UniProtKB/Swiss-Prot annotation:
Residues 251-431 are annotated as: Interaction with SMC1A. It comes from Macaca fascicularis. Residues 446-642 are annotated as: Interaction with the C-terminus of CDCA1 and the SPBC24-SPBC25 subcomplex. The keyword Kinase does not apply. Component of the NDC80 complex, which consists of NDC80/HEC1, CDCA1, SPBC24 and SPBC25. The NDC80 complex is formed by two subcomplexes composed of NDC80/HEC1-CDCA1 and SPBC24-SPBC25. Each subcomplex is formed by parallel interactions through the coiled-coil domains of individual subunits. Formation of a tetrameric complex is mediated by interactions between the C-terminal regions of both subunits of the NDC80/HEC1-CDCA1 subcomplex and the N-terminal regions of both subunits of the SPBC24-SPBC25 complex. Phosphorylation begins in S phase of the cell cycle and peaks in mitosis. Phosphorylated by NEK2. Also phosphorylated by AURKA and AURKB. Acetylated at Lys-53 and Lys-59 by KAT5 during mitosis, promoting robust kinetochore-microtubule attachment. Deacetylated by SIRT1. The modification Phosphoserine is found at S44, S55, S62, S69, S165, S242. This is Kinetochore protein NDC80 homolog. GO terms for biological process: attachment of mitotic spindle microtubules to kinetochore; cell division; chromosome segregation; metaphase chromosome alignment; mitotic spindle organization; positive regulation of mitotic cell cycle spindle assembly checkpoint. PANTHER family: KINETOCHORE PROTEIN NDC80 (PTHR10643), KINETOCHORE PROTEIN NDC80 HOMOLOG (PTHR10643:SF2). Residues 1-250 are annotated as: Nuclear localization. Residues 261-403, 458-639 form a coiled coil.
Length: 642
C-alpha cells in the first residue's frame, strides 16, 4: 500500500543557504492571554483572565537557539501574495462545494447547503469554524467575545500563510470577504485531512529497514537520506554553511548499500560523456539550422499536396480511360454493323447482276425502257420538289403551332402556379370561394377552346381583386394606426429610460454621499482615538513626574529631618496643590472624554437624520431595496461603534 507524502506548510526548507532569521519571540503551545480593549468614557474593569485551551498546531520554538551566519538574513515578515484565483467564481464555487461536502459527510449538526454557503452570517461562520477546529482540538470552545481576534490568531498559529483581518470577521458574507474566508476554511479542511492521515498511517520505517514504500508521486522513503538531512539541518542551525563531511559519509554509505563497482562507474561516466557530446553535437546542429523542423514540415506539406494532385490526376486518367473504353466498344459495334450491311449489299448486287445476266430484252426495248425511265425520273423529281416545298410549309406551320402551344402552356403553367400560391385552385381551396379557376387546355377542341374560360375565370377573379384591394386598404389603415401607436410606445419607452437613468444617477449620488459620510465618521473615530491616546500618554507622563517629585521629596525628608518642623507647613501646602492639580487634570480628562462621546453621538444622529431625509423620497422599488440595505449597514456600523 502506498503512503501519501505530506508536506507541511512552514517546516519545510527550500534552500540550504537561506532563511537565516529566527523568531525568538514565537509562542509555545499555549495561546496568549486575552487583552483588555479600552472603552470610551468608562472606567476599565479588570476581568479575570482564564487560560485558553492548548493548540495542537501552535508556533514552534527553535531548539538550538539563535543562529549566526555570514550569508545574510531574510525577514519572515514579507507579505506573501495569494496565488489562488479568489476572483474566479468557478474556483469559489468549487471551494464552497468542498466545504459543504465535508460538513455533510462528517455529521455537521446544522442544516447546510450550497445556497446557504453563498453568503453566510457571522453566527453560521463561527459554528462552522468551531466544528472544523474541533477535529484538531476536540476540547476547544470559541469564546463569547473577541472572536474577531481569536479566529485570525488560530489560523496564524496553524501556519496559514495569508493574513485574515479583524474587520473581515464582521462582514463574513460580503462579496469581497467571503472568498478569502472560504479559501481559508478549505485550507483548514486540508489540514484536518492531513492530520487524520498522519494519525492513521503507519511508521515510515521499521527497525533495520533503510528503504520505505513508494509514495503516490514516485518518491522512495529513504531512512539513510532522512538521517543525512537531519544531520545537515542540525549542523546548519548550529552555524555551519558547508556539509562536505556529511556528503562524504553519505556517499560511502550509499556505495556500501548499493554495492557500487568502480569499474562500472567509470564505464557509466564514459557513456555519460559520450551522451553529453552527442547532445552538444545535436544542440550545435539545431543552432546551425534552427528552422529545420519548420522546413521539414513545409516540405511534408508540399509533398502531401503533390500526392493529392497526383491522386486527382490518376483519378482523371482512370475516368478518361473508362470513357475511351466505352467509345472503343461503341466503335467495335459500329464496325460489326457496317460489315454486316456491306455483306448484305454485296449479296443484293450479286442477285441483281444475276437478274441482269438472265434477262431477254432487245436493244430497242432497252432504249424505250430507258426513255420511259428518264421521263418517269423527271416526273418523280418534279413531284419530289413539290413534296419538299409542301413538307417545308407543313414544317413551318407545325413549328409555329408548337411555339404557340408552348407559349400558351407556359402562360397556363405560370397562371396555375400563381393560382396555387394564392390558394385559388383546386376548387375547394381557401380563397376560391367555390369557383373553379383551373383552365384546361385542349388544342384538339379547336381555336375556341379557351373562350368559355373568360366568363368562368375573369368575372370571379375581378370580384376577388376588388375584395382584396379593400382588405389591403383596411390593413394599410390598421398598419398606419399601429405605427402611430408604436411611435407613442417608443416615446414612452424613451421617457422611461430617461427617468430610469435619472433615478440611477440619483441613487449613485446617494451612494457616494453615504460612502462619504461613512468615511467622515471613520476619520472622526480615528481622530478621537488618537486624541484619547495622547491624553493617556499625557496622564502617564504626569503620574511619572509626580512619582519622581514625591521620591525626591521623601529623600529630602530623610536628609533634613531636623528641619521637618520648619518646612512641614510648606510640604503640606505643596502636597495639597499637587492633589488639586491631579484632580483637576482627571476632571478635564473625564470632561473631554464625555464631550468626545457626545460629539460622536451627535455625528451618528446627524448621519442617521441625513440618511432618513435622503431615503424619504419615493423614487422606485429598487431605491427602497437599496435603502433597506443601507439601513442594515448603518445599524451594523452603529452597533460596532457602540
Amino acid at each position: 500500500m502506498k503512503r501519501s507524502s505530506v508536506s507541511t506548510g512552514g517546516a519545510g526548507r527550500l534552500s540550504m543557504q537561506e532563511l537565516r532569521s529566527q523568531d525568538v519571540n514565537k509562542q509555545g503551545l499555549y495561546t496568549p492571554q486575552t487583552k483588555e480593549r479600552p472603552t470610551f468614557g468608562k472606567l476599565s474593569i479588570n476581568k479575570p483572565t482564564s487560560e485558553r485551551k492548548v493548540s495542537l498546531f501552535g508556533k514552534r520554538t527553535s531548539g538550538h537557539g539563535s543562529r549566526n551566519s555570514q550569508l545574510g538574513i531574510f525577514s519572515s515578515s514579507e507579505k506573501i501574495k495569494d496565488p489562488r484565483p479568489l476572483n474566479d467564481k468557478a474556483f469559489i464555487q468549487q471551494c464552497i462545494r468542498q466545504l459543504c461536502e465535508f460538513l455533510t459527510e462528517n455529521g455537521y449538526a446544522h442544516n447546510v447547503s450550497m445556497k446557504s454557503l453563498q453568503a453566510p452570517s457571522v453566527k453560521d461562520f463561527l459554528k462552522i469554524f468551531t466544528f472544523l477546529y474541533g477535529f484538531l482540538c476536540p476540547s476547544y470552545e470559541l469564546p463569547d467575545t473577541k472572536f474577531e481576534e481569536e479566529v485570525p490568531r488560530i489560523f496564524k498559529d496553524l501556519g496559514y500563510p495569508f493574513a485574515l483581518s479583524k474587520s473581515s470577521m464582521y462582514t463574513v458574507g460580503a462579496p469581497h470577504t467571503w472568498p478569502h474566508i472560504v479559501a481559508a476554511l478549505v485550507w483548514l479542511i486540508d489540514c484536518i485531512k492531513i492530520h487524520t492521515a498522519m494519525k492513521e498511517s503507519s511508521p515510515l520505517f521499521d527497525d533495520g529497514q533503510p528503504w520505505g514504500e513508494e509514495t503516490e508521486d514516485g518518491i522512495m522513503h529513504n531512512k539513510l537520506f532522512l538521517d543525512y538531512t537531519i544531520k545537515c539541518y542540525e549542523s546548519f542551525m548550529s552555524g555551519a554553511d558547508s556539509f562536505d563531511e556529511m556528503n562524504a559519509e553519505l556517499q560511502s554509505k550509499l556505495k556500501d548499500l548499493f554495492n557500487v563497482d568502480a569499474f562500472k562507474l567509470e564505464s557509466l561516466e564514459a557513456k555519460n560523456r559520450a551522451l553529453n557530446e552527442q547532445i552538444a553535437r545535436l544542440e550545435q546542429e539545431r543552432e546551425k539550422e534552427p528552422n529545420r523542423l519548420e522546413s521539414l514540415r513545409k516540405l511534408k506539406a508540399s509533398l502531401q499536396g503533390d500526392v493529392q494532385k497526383y491522386q486527382a490526376y490518376m483519378s482523371n486518367l482512370e475516368s478518361h480511360s473508362a470513357i475511351l473504353d466505352q467509345k472503343l466498344n461503341g466503335l467495335n459495334e459500329e464496325i460489326a454493323r457496317v460489315e454486316l450491311e456491306c455483306e448484305t449489299i454485296k449479296q443484293e448486287n450479286t442477285r441483281l447482276q444475276n437478274i441482269i445476266d438472265n434477262q431477254k430484252y432487245s436493244v430497242a426495248d432497252i432504249e424505250r425502257i430507258n426513255h420511259e425511265r428518264n421521263e418517269l425520273q423527271q416526273t418523280i423529281n418534279k413531284l419530289t420538289k413539290d413534296l419538299e416545298a409542301e413538307q417545308q410549309k407543313l414544317w413551318n406551320e407545325e413549328l409555329k403551332y408548337a411555339r404557340g402551344k408552348e407559349a400558351i402552356e407556359t402562360q397556363l403553367a405560370e397562371y396555375h402556379k400563381l393560382a396555387r400560391k394564392l390558394k385559388l385552385i383546386p376548387k375547394g381551396a381557401e380563397n376560391s370561394k367555390g369557383y373553379d379557376f383551373e383552365i384546361k387546355f385542349n388544342p384538339e377542341a379547336g381555336a375556341n377552346c379557351l373562350v368559355k374560360y373568360r366568363a368562368q375565370v375573369y368575372v370571379p377573379l375581378k370580384e376577388l381583386l376588388n375584395e382584396t384591394e379593400e382588405e389591403i386598404n383596411k390593413a394599410r389603415n390598421k398598419k398606419m394606426g399601429l405605427e402611430d401607436t408604436l411611435e407613442q410606445l417608443n416615446a414612452m419607452i424613451t421617457e422611461s429610460k430617461r427617468s430610469v437613468r435619472t433615478l440611477k444617477e440619483e441613487v449613485q449620488k446617494l451612494d457616494d454621499l453615504y460612502q462619504q459620510k461613512i468615511k467622515e465618521a471613520e476619520e472622526e473615530d480615528e481622530k478621537c482615538a488618537s486624541e484619547l491616546e495622547s491624553l493617556e500618554k499625557h496622564k502617564h507622563l504626569l503620574e511619572s513626574t509626580v512619582n519622581q517629585g514625591l521620591s525626591e521629596a521623601m529623600n529630602e525628608l530623610d536628609a533634613v529631618q531636623r528641619e521637618y518642623q520648619l518646612v512641614v507647613q510648606t510640604t503640606t501646602e505643596e502636597r495639597r496643590k499637587v492633589g488639586n492639580n491631579l484632580q483637576r487634570l482627571l476632571e478635564m480628562v473625564a470632561t473631554h472624554v464625555g464631550s468626545v462621546e457626545k460629539h460622536l453621538e451627535e455625528q451618528i444622529a446627524k448621519a442617521d437624520r441625513e440618511y432618513e431625509e435622503c431615503m424619504s423620497e419615493d423614487l422606485s422599488e429598487n431605491i427602497k431595496e437599496i435603502r433597506d440595505k443601507y439601513e442594515k449597514k448603518a445599524a451594523l456600523i452603529k452597533s460596532s461603534g457602540e
